[in-house]
Amino acid sequence: MEWIINQLRDHPELAIFLTLFAGFWLGRFKIGKFSLGTVTSVLLVGVLVGQLNISVDGPMKAVFFLLFLFAVGYKVGPQFFRGLKKDGLPQVGFAVLMCIVSLIAPWILAKIMGYHVGEAAGLLAGSQTISAVIGVASDTINQLSISDAQKATFINAIPVAYAVTYIFGTAGSAWILASLGPKMLGGLEKVKADCKELEAKMGTSEADEPGFYTALRPVVFRAYKIDNEWFGKGKTVSELENYLVENDKRLFVERVRQKGVIEEVTPDMLLQPGDEVVLSGRREYAIGEEDWIGPEVIDAQLLDFPAETLPVMVTHRTFAGEKVSTIRALKFMHGVSIRSIKRAGINVPVLAQTVIDSGDILELTGTKLEVETAAKQMGYIDRPTNQTDMIFVGLGILLGGLVGALAIHLGGIPISLSTSGGALIAGLVFGWLRSKHPTFGGIPEPSLWVLNNVGLNMFIAVVGIAAGPSFVTGFKEVGFSLFIVGALATAIPLLSGLLMGRYLFKFHPALTLGCTAGARTTTAALGAIQDALGSDTPALGYTVTYAVGNTLLIIWGVAIVLLM
């Protein structure tokens, strides 16, 4: 054991990977629905490893933190700038107000309790579950005109306060929004009914059973043998498809076999009893059609044709701001189904009245030719790739860091975004540029996950190890009262957001809950809300507010230091 400890001291990089391994492993465990989460687990393991007095020096901590912040900005950039347009301003205004409350509440509570700047920053980071504040606040503290010893004391106190307040910040947020939230908006059953009404209003063609997640329904291809009298002496392909649409069944004839020969499908092709047809569309539309068309047939030859699902980034201005129903009706969408819509990494319900934004990723499914034709009309085919444009990433962080390093002096105090704030802003701008010009700057989802999660947790691991020797002393100083203060700092902005959404902005209850979760950037709470309501509609209010909230709450790491 002593040999292992000595090796960790001699090779601190191994201590970091020990922290990552154990932290990610611990973060997988759940008690009921509660989990510490990866970030808190990595921090606590880092604190334990730090008891071995391991010195972790060098720029590695800053490097990984900058990668993380750039990834955060890159992910939400398109939606952040999209929200600044006229129709997104109410949600932007809501997010800004709620973020201001999210800063003021911890600040006032910290002043009342007599906390120093490090404890206040940790309170903000943990109660609002915005881990990046740890790094941004640390950078800002390092710019203060105080002794190095004071800087170290303040910076080492941040993870202590963060760890104490993060638990309720996560679990409490989900409980408040999923349990108290619906009650404050008229009661759970009323809000559920309001969600079903919104779903019906936004797209009556979608199935409306409780808990039916439209974005996750697969598209299927099924074959039937025609034997219904409705076809009489024959119906054309277009007549059959129009009849299906009139009955809220958006299905397409993809293949026809007549007299044993598979024929090319045309709109005026005559379908007669005995013919075999392949229909494509959402599963809920295709199931049951054999009751009137005819029996389903399982025929490998008939169903053996190229089908494709393509992710398409919407870049053409013609389609930005259009509803799903409008896009579905376009000629080039014949035979093509929208399988899912992703916005800032969040699945948005596929309803007839859902508005498509520039930068949205649409999954289109159908035959290879039809899907590729539709994809080229709508935007850029974002085919899966394993290559990250590191020229784009490196240049973005460099330029952002240089801008963030610029400082203005107020009363002799240098004030700047810091290199970390600059990297975040660069990520926003570069992510937006990528949505407008998708031929460059690509970062695949797995790579973005690595930049986001490994970047943050590498940083947190180093923070935990460095704070380890002073963590226990710091915890004794703040005491259990900090947990109560943290719970108040978590609850006040959330309750304020619910009241603002209902009475000031007069949002729909589903949007109020989604906007509140988004402004606080708590994805776990969004999932809890959707489970409680049995509806995906709260996600419609999440993406814009998440983009704004993620940006402002990180910048508040600078603000809380200056306010204290």
From Swiss-Prot:
GO biological process: potassium ion transport
One Pfam family linked to the record: Asp-Al_Ex
Membrane-related topology note: Multi-pass membrane protein
Main subcellular location: membrane
InterPro entries: AAE_transporter (IPR050144), Asp_Ala_antiprt (IPR022457), RCK_C (IPR006037), RCK_C_sf (IPR036721), YidE_YbjL (IPR006512)
Transmembrane feature ranges: 12-29, 34-56, 63-82, 92-109, 116-138, 158-180, 391-413, 449-471, 478-500, 541-563
Subcellular location: Cell membrane
GO MF, one example: monoatomic cation transmembrane transporter activity
Record's GO cellular component terms: plasma membrane
Keywords, ordered alphabetically: Cell membrane, Membrane, Transmembrane, Transmembrane helix, Transport
Domain (RCK C-terminal) ranges: 295-380
Matching NCBIfam families: Asp_Ala_antiprt, YidE_YbjL_dupl
UniProt cross-references to PANTHER family, sorted A to Z: K(+)_H(+) ANTIPORTER SUBUNIT KHTT, PTHR30445:SF9
Sequence similarity: Belongs to the AAE transporter (TC 2.A.81) family.
Protein name as annotated: Uncharacterized transporter BT_0736
Organism: Bacteroides thetaiotaomicron (strain ATCC 29148 / DSM 2079 / JCM 5827 / CCUG 10774 / NCTC 10582 / VPI-5482 / E50)
